[in-house]
């Protein structure tokens, strides 16, 4: 076996939450009378650092600090998270990889405390050696 360990991304890879990310950012864009985006545009322009992504969408951080829009998005995402599902076949794929002898981890830009909860809520904790998010938001 050439590879022994698989590192997964959480948002958009295991978790089918792109629709919620688009919905959340569009709420913030609408509030500021900025042009809303589609899922296709989101996939083209989203990047890290997230502040740069917001600026590309038209947010002006001379008028309002990034933290205001960022916190607004995080609050909306948290409020609606219960609607988010895993991508199809995630559980069976993780199980098959575990049976095949691969160890697995998650590396995410999501806040650690939320990431731990989200993985647990979706019943996936048993598949991962390490679940690593960020310490700040």
Task: Give residue ranges: language-model regions.
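Short, acidic loop-to-helix structural element flanking the phosphoryl-transfer center
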Residues: 78-106, 112-116
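Hydrophobic packing residues within well-ordered alpha-helices of enzyme cores
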Residues: 25, 54, 90, 115-119, ...
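Residue-level recognition of specific faces of alpha-helices
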Residues: 44, 53, 93, 127-130
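N-terminal helical cap/lid subdomain that shapes the substrate entry/recognition surface
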Residues: 3-88
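Short helix-capping segments at alpha-helix termini
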Residues: 30-36, 99-100, 123-127
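Small/polar loops that bind or transfer phosphate-bearing groups
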Residues: 17, 106-107
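Substrate-recognition "cap/lid" segment bordering the active-site pocket of phosphatases
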Residues: 83, 112-137
């Amino acid at each position: 076996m050439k590879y022994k360990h698989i590192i997964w991304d959480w948002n958009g890879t295991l978790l089918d939450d792109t629709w919620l990310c688009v919905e959340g950012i569009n709420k913030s864009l609408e509030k500021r009378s900025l042009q809303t985006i589609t899922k296709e545009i989101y996939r083209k322009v989203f990047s890290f650092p997230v502040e740069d992504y917001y600026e590309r969408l038209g947010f002006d951080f001379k008028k309002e600090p990034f933290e205001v829009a960022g916190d607004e998005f995080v609050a909306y995402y948290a409020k609606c998270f219960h609607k988010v599902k895993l991508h199809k076949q995630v559980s069976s794929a993780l199980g098959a990889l575990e049976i095949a002898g691969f160890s697995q981890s998650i590396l995410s830009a999501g806040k650690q405390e939320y990431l731990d909860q989200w993985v647990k809520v979706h019943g996936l904790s048993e598949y991962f050696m390490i679940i690593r998010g960020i310490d700040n938001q």
